[in-house]
Amino acid sequence: MERQLDAYCEHLRSERQVSPHTLSAYRRDLDKVLGWCIKQNIGSWQALDIQRLRSLIARLHAQGQSSRSLARLLSAVRGLYHYLNRECLCDHDPATGLAPPKGERRLPKTLDTDRALQLLEGAVEDDFLARRDQAILELFYSSGLRLSELTGLNLDQLDLADGMVQVLGKGSKTRLLPVGKKAREALEQWLPLRALTNPSDDAVFVSQQGRRLGPRAIQVRVKLAGERELGQNLHPHMLRHSFASHLLESSQDLRAVQELLGHSDIKTTQIYTHLDFQHLAAVYDSAHPRAKRMKGDDS
């Protein structure tokens, strides 16, 4: 079973060209299923049936796994069995018809506009780390990149003259994104310092040793910036969420935001409309002359 799982992961890496982040997540999920099979004395993927897979889902849910995590696990299982069926190693899919337990969908955390400006408009020292980190923060917020997209960004994907960046998103889909003025300025100040490290490849963001920054290193630098400038925990996806929320709030163009984020399904983008409604409700509560009386009226 493990050998077939290894072959499937290699298929995802070499043929499907999924990102390292996605591949790692799928492997973790499928390792959980494999471990469950071993404990249940299930000796092959063919022997795993819907009843036993349902038992695993119920067990993980009872242990606190979110509906979203379980949905991803089931998606990974379906992908594995699609591959096994194609390779004539199995003739069924135990995940067919299975759905994760419904859970309350959490709204993404964002910075409000003032906090985003506070993060980005602080004084920036003229040194390697400060200039690099500022360019990272500005690009996340300006263009709404995923962490994997920024990590994999190469010089030939940047067109600062026209203010555009081409990114490779999920499913190896490319999209062209605008780069705002402040982000362009930050990149223009960073790139000469980058060149001094004699980088080993074409990565836009490198370490002081000239090596491409990995996802973990970028997460750490964003977290440090959040603690220093805002006194709060900050992660790259919060900047992407903030980009989407602020753009939707200003433009009210859901389709445009979907395209910029690279969402294949507009339902994924629609969660930001709930954030926009929260903002409108807060404005109403603070500004409408009847709001306070209505909020305090228990009758």
From Swiss-Prot:
Cellular-component GO terms for this entry: cytoplasm
Keywords: Cell cycle, Cell division, Chromosome partition, Cytoplasm, DNA integration, DNA recombination, DNA-binding
Location of the active site: 146, 170, 237, 240, 263, 272 (o-(3'-phospho-dna)-tyrosine intermediate)
A Pfam family per the record: Phage_int_SAM_1
GO molecular function: DNA binding; tyrosine-based site-specific recombinase activity
Main localisation: cytoplasm
Protein name (database record): Tyrosine recombinase XerC
